[in-house]
């Protein structure tokens, strides 16, 4: 998209958004790998809950930011971000809500 004669990628705010999105995606991936490694050792309750909580909330934040960058096109079915926006929301609900994951994490920390 072009705004005020510049592409959105030229704006510092967009660059910061993209950087934050990349950090969230990478951190989510690393938490998932850590949970998988813990599962291999027979102890993954806390790690899995942390990965699920962070990744699902990050998915929603990243998709929301992507939607903002795309503007009106983010709501058009021809662009994948519209589908991601709908799909990301359910990640905080299935296999345990964010609140349930927080309960699991705190229970494990207090052991």
State what each model feature region is:
Residues 1-111:
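Alpha-helical interface subdomain recognition
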């Amino acid at each position: 998209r072009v705004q005020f004669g510049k592409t959105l990628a030229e704006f510092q705010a967009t660059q910061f958004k993209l950087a934050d999105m990349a950090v969230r995606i990478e951190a989510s991936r690393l938490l998932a790998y850590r949970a998988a490694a813990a599962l291999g050792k027979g102890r993954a309750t806390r790690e899995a809950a942390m990965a699920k909580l962070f990744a699902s909330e990050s998915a929603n934040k990243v998709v929301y930011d992507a939607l903002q960058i795309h503007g009106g096109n983010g709501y058009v079915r021809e662009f994948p971000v519209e589908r991601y926006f709908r799909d990301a929301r359910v990640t905080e609900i299935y296999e345990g809500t964010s609140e349930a994951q927080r309960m699991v994490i705190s229970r494990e920390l207090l052991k």
